[in-house]
Amino acid sequence: MMKIVLISGKRKCGKDYISERLQRRLGSRSCIVRISEPIKSEWARKLQLDLDALLGDGPYKEKYRRDMIVWSDEVRAQDYGYFCRVAMEEALSRQQTPYILVSDVRRKNDIRWFRETYGPERVITLRLTSRPETRSARGWTFTAGIDDVPSECDLDDLADGFDVVLANDEELDQEAIDILLDRLQLQYR
């Protein structure tokens, strides 16, 4: 049975890092899905931007972040699962794996879509937290209109909580990753 791990957290809390560490341990039995990929692909196509730079982690993406958030919220207002669906369709057309790691869940409706589409028994929620000083050391600076909008704050008050919460303030060794996989009930051996 396919398991889907929905990874969420604030900017610069290590969502990509943890996703990549989990995938490395799970190997070819897993793939990383990014809900932001279809957002960035459509935005780049629409404005004729450099998609590779937009997919990266540098200042180019930050320059367009606020406008992408506004536009993607408009799309979600019409179809809350649109970007989740497109990201999953693209990923599953490339590779079928027992474990899907969705590295950038940001909204309650993202979680809702995955639970409705695949069933709650297949969906595991992982919330990453990091202290503000840790995030700052990773390059985060509070930005009004980005850090105080639903794309960053919607999951702060998730009513039914998360299946697993992980403080990600230090580099995790392999044992910590294995413990996390056990807590997520994912077979890695």
Curated annotation (Swiss-Prot):
EC number: 2.7.4.2
Subcellular localization, as worded in the UniProt entry: Cytoplasm, Cytosol
Main location, first listed in the record: cytoplasm
Binding annotation for substrate: N168
Residues given in the record as ATP binding sites: K10, R11, K12, C13, G14, K15, D16, R138
UniProt-listed GO biological process terms: cholesterol biosynthetic process; isopentenyl diphosphate biosynthetic process, mevalonate pathway; isoprenoid biosynthetic process
Gene3D superfamilies linked: P-loop containing nucleotide triphosphate hydrolases (3.40.50.300)
Alphabetized Pfam families for the sequence: P-mevalo_kinase
Keyword Lipid biosynthesis set for record: yes
GO molecular function: ATP binding; phosphomevalonate kinase activity
Keyword Transferase applies: yes
Catalytic activity, reaction form: (R)-5-phosphomevalonate + ATP = (R)-5-diphosphomevalonate + ADP
UniProt xrefs under PANTHER family: PHOSPHOMEVALONATE KINASE
Protein name per Swiss-Prot or TrEMBL: Phosphomevalonate kinase
Name of the gene encoding the protein in the UniProt record: Pmvk
